[in-house]
């Protein structure tokens, strides 16, 4: 009888082992993204988290590559002052972003981030807050190989137009 109970308990523990999709929040990849966001805000982001073969989808089905993505990051700082990122409402803001990393056993690691991006246009003078969602697919080398950004780019496009008009 004791052996039967031991076998049952052992089977229970083995059966509870997670072998499917696993979601984590304070893991190496999620923390690497938080560090990259801090570098972005400090204007020291160097793209070291990205693979040189990066496919960057910014609200588009047509990707841009690594060099263009680096230029896009720089353009944001050329067009906006006082850039910040936050997750939460009102006084409950406690994180730069809400980030989770999911391990799909047959697909790989995917991270997702949600935050509110805020900045003041250098040409319009308008302060905007834009909800953002970004998905990241990690390669086997620990670098991001695909990035999908989802946000309303209306104000960004208008700010680009104002900057071009000012340059004429």
List the model feature ranges, each with a label.
Residues 7-8:
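Short, intrinsically disordered, low-complexity terminal segments
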Residues 12-15:
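C-terminal motif of bacterial Sec signal peptides marking the signal peptidase cleavage site
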Residues 17-168:
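C-terminal and inter-domain tail/linker signature
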